[in-house]
């Protein structure tokens, strides 16, 4: 009887551990802090933006598999501090995503479509999950502050990054 109770407790514990979402689980919510200009006060204010990983992954799957060859130039290469030969640019620190496909140095040919190319792409993603109009020319749709990062050519989800202020400047990994 004691053995059966212990077996039941072990099984219940295993089920609850397995049911908990992993950090890169599609059910994850990513939080990005972005400074946005308040039009009433004309001052920059921190905004907490929430992104669904499932919606961000969906955005990346709707994006064409190209590097800047659309009307909007998205998706395009996310250098992550590297040159096209996989050498780290002096003074740059790459973002660590915690996935081998995402963290390895890139190989990016001149046109971005070489047989052995592997690199990261960035594509706009939004809290409401709508798809970015990648073929919009001028005026192109506002890409917002956040980007879903994924691999070329196999579209492995790496994470969500965001600009710290508006939609300009360095990109930082959002928390999840």
UniProtKB/Swiss-Prot annotation:
<feature type="active site" description="Proton donor">
    <location>
        <position position="163"/>
    </location>
</feature>
<dbReference type="GO" id="GO:0005576">
    <property type="term" value="C:extracellular region"/>
</dbReference>
<dbReference type="GO" id="GO:0004521">
    <property type="term" value="F:RNA endonuclease activity"/>
</dbReference>
<dbReference type="GO" id="GO:0017148">
    <property type="term" value="P:negative regulation of translation"/>
</dbReference>
<dbReference type="InterPro" id="IPR000026">
    <property type="entry name" value="N1-like"/>
</dbReference>
<dbReference type="Pfam" id="PF00545">
    <property type="entry name" value="Ribonuclease"/>
</dbReference>
<feature type="disulfide bond">
    <location>
        <begin position="32"/>
        <end position="174"/>
    </location>
</feature>
<dbReference type="GO" id="GO:0003723">
    <property type="term" value="F:RNA binding"/>
</dbReference>
<feature type="active site">
    <location>
        <position position="76"/>
    </location>
</feature>
<comment type="similarity">
    <text>Belongs to the ribonuclease U2 family.</text>
</comment>
<dbReference type="InterPro" id="IPR004025">
    <property type="entry name" value="Fun_ribotoxin"/>
</dbReference>
<keyword id="KW-0732">Signal</keyword>
<keyword id="KW-0964">Secreted</keyword>
<comment type="function">
    <text>This purine-specific ribonuclease cleaves 28S RNA in eukaryotic ribosomes, inhibits protein synthesis, and shows antitumor activity.</text>
</comment>
<protein>
    <recommendedName>
        <fullName>Ribonuclease mitogillin</fullName>
        <ecNumber>3.1.27.-</ecNumber>
    </recommendedName>
</protein>
<feature type="active site" description="Proton acceptor">
    <location>
        <position position="122"/>
    </location>
</feature>
<keyword id="KW-1015">Disulfide bond</keyword>
<dbReference type="InterPro" id="IPR016191">
    <property type="entry name" value="Ribonuclease/ribotoxin"/>
</dbReference>
<keyword id="KW-0378">Hydrolase</keyword>
<dbReference type="InterPro" id="IPR048269">
    <property type="entry name" value="RNase_U2"/>
</dbReference>
<keyword id="KW-0652">Protein synthesis inhibitor</keyword>
<keyword id="KW-0540">Nuclease</keyword>
<feature type="disulfide bond">
    <location>
        <begin position="102"/>
        <end position="158"/>
    </location>
</feature>
<feature type="signal peptide">
    <location>
        <begin position="1"/>
        <end position="27"/>
    </location>
</feature>
């Amino acid at each position: 009887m004691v053995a059966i109770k212990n077996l039941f407790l072990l099984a219940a514990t295993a089920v609850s551990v397995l049911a908990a979402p992993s950090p890169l689980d599609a059910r994850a919510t990513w939080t990005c802090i972005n400074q946005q200009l308040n039009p009433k006060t004309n001052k920059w204010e921190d905004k907490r933006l929430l992104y669904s990983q499932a919606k961000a992954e969906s955005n990346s799957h709707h994006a064409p598999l190209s590097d800047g060859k659309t009307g909007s130039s998205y998706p395009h290469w996310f250098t992550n501090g590297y040159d096209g030969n996989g050498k780290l640019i002096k003074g740059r620190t790459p973002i660590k995503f915690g996935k081998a496909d995402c963290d390895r140095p890139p190989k990016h040919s001149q046109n971005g479509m070489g047989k052995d190319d592997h690199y990261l792409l960035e594509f706009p993603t939004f809290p409401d999950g709508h798809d970015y109009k990648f073929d919009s020319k001028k005026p192109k749709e506002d890409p917002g502050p956040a980007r879903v990062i994924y691999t070329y050519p196999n579209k492995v989800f790496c994470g969500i990054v965001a600009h710290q202020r508006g939609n300009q400047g360095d990109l930082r990994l959002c928390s999840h």
